[in-house]
Amino acid sequence: MAYCAPYCCSVPTGPATTICSSDKFCRCGVCLPSTCPHEISLLQPTCCDNCPPPCCVPDTYVPTCWLLNSSHPTPGLSGINLTTFVQPGCDNVCEPRC
């Protein structure tokens, strides 16, 4: 069984990257799809856990979309303190922990 962080998770469908705020502890993982259509100006994060705000991170405006799980530099996130990582093989993915 792979180790899963208690406050981060990945979405159950396809490869995905979980973005968690690194400057404060949040029990709820904010999950973004690993891919998205071109020419999109707004990413809508979704909470994997059934928790009320402030667990949910507000909308993040970016100039373009990119593959989060890739080696390419992430555009448009200067000034935002984020930590990204991929959790493969979690048995109970996105299980509510509140």
Swiss-Prot record:
One of its GO terms (molecular function) is structural molecule activity. The modification N-acetylalanine is found at A2. InterPro entries: Keratin_matx. One of its GO terms (cellular component) is keratin filament. Keywords: Acetylation, Keratin, Repeat. It comes from the Eukaryota. Residues 3-59 are annotated as: 4 X 5 AA repeats of C-C-X(3). Pfam families: Keratin_matx. Sequence repeats lie at residues 3-7, 8-12, 47-51, 55-59. In the hair cortex, hair keratin intermediate filaments are embedded in an interfilamentous matrix, consisting of hair keratin-associated proteins (KRTAP), which are essential for the formation of a rigid and resistant hair shaft through their extensive disulfide bond cross-linking with abundant cysteine residues of hair keratins. The matrix proteins include the high-sulfur and high-glycine-tyrosine keratins. PANTHER family: KERATIN ASSOCIATED PROTEIN 3-3-RELATED, KERATIN-ASSOCIATED PROTEIN 3-1. Belongs to the KRTAP type 3 family. This is Keratin-associated protein 3-1. The gene is KRTAP3-1.
